[in-house]
């Protein structure tokens, strides 16, 4: 397995810059693993492919406005801080621009002093650890001062920040959206429930490491980022009941896949709990819990493309991607969706 095995040609104009309206009007490519057949549908047709007793597992993380624009306390020079991972109550792993100015002890002021950050030191990946000082509730300050951190390949301003949140987002803490969930509307979720599909909620807070490129030709040598997950006892019990009843577990997004496969025993039993996962799923991996997947179209040479290749098979996925390009599907975070059965 080589990194180049996961490359494909993508015209830039197919990288979606804005989401479609309504959410479930996006296209849906249905990939059948057993037959290799590929269908072209609309996302609102999803209920036709799910059966009573199936379980849909959604990630209810909420994207935080993690981009902070501030200035150096000493000189007034502009600084940008991107929150990546909460290490302690007021200590964060961040990315800082310009990084050369972010030396230990440097103080960065945001919102006329409502929030002040002190650089503690560097991280392993070129970022900075920052301690924040403030009065009140940090989350409230961030909602007031922060901006939504859109992926680097989206160049247009987002008119409605809520369009980069799923309709079921609850648990504050992600630096990027679990984008497969962006296609769901409340009405579509109601239709699925009326069909007898069970909906189970888990949480994985998405870090910007999800956009970190693989830089080694042997992907197995890639160091995965770690992300925080939480699976409640209620969710675990419901998910296990789906499997015992003969239903399929349909993960919404690669984040749900990584969470389920982290907490599943060898026999597929899902255990409740929380912690950090750096699971890396690539071809050859044996899935323990996940039977099907709703996902978006991923970047060339990315760990997410490797994950979907592990589930559907490398050759079938690459054929599906070539067909998606030929059929002018929209790619990446605001793009169209794929259902792998």
Swiss-Prot record:
Pathway: tRNA modification; tRNA-queuosine biosynthesis. Keywords: Cytoplasm, Queuosine biosynthesis, S-adenosyl-L-methionine, Transferase. The keyword Repeat does not apply. This is S-adenosylmethionine:tRNA ribosyltransferase-isomerase. Belongs to the QueA family. It is found in: Cytoplasm. It catalyses: 7-aminomethyl-7-carbaguanosine(34) in tRNA + S-adenosyl-L-methionine = epoxyqueuosine(34) in tRNA + adenine + L-methionine + 2 H(+).
């Amino acid at each position: 397995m080589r990194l180049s095995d996961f490359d494909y040609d993508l015209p830039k104009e197919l990288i979606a810059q804005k989401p479609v309206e309504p959410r479930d009007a996006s296209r849906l490519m249905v990939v059948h693993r057993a037959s290799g057949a590929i269908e072209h549908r609309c996302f609102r047709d999803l209920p036709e492919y799910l059966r009573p007793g199936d379980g849909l597992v959604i990630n209810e993380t909420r994207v935080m406005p993690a981009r902070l624009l501030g200035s150096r306390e000493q000189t007034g020079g502009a600084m940008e801080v991107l929150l990546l991972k909460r290490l302690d109550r007021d200590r964060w792993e961040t990315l800082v621009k310009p990084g050369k100015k972010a030396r230990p002890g440097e103080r960065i002021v945001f919102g006329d002093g409502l929030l002040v950050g002190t650089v503690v030191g560097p991280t392993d990946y070129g970022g900075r650890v920052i301690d924040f000082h403030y009065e009140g509730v940090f989350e409230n300050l961030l909602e007031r001062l922060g901006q939504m951190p859109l992926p680097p390949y989206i160049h247009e301003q987002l008119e409605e920040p809520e369009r980069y949140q799923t309709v079921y987002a609850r648990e504050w803490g992600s630096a990027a959206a679990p984008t497969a969930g962006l296609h769901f509307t409340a009405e579509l979720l109601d239709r699925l429930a009326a069909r007898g599909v069970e909906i189970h909620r888990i949480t994985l807070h998405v870090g910007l490491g999800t956009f970190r490129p693989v830089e080694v030709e042997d992907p197995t040598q890639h160091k995965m980022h770690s992300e925080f997950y939480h699976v409640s006892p209620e969710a675990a019990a419901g998910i296990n009941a789906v499997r015992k009843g003969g239903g399929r577990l349909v993960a919404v997004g690669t984040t749900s896949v990584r969470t389920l496969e982290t907490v599943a025993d060898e026999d597929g039993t899902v255990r409740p709990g929380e912690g950090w996962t750096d699971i890396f799923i690539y071809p050859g991996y044996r899935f323990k819990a996940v039977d099907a997947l709703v996902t978006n179209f991923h970047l060339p040479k990315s760990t997410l493309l490797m994950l979907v290749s592990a589930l559907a098979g490398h050759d079938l996925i690459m054929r599906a991607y070539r067909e998606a390009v030929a059929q002018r599907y929209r790619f990446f975070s605001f793009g169209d969706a794929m259902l792998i059965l």
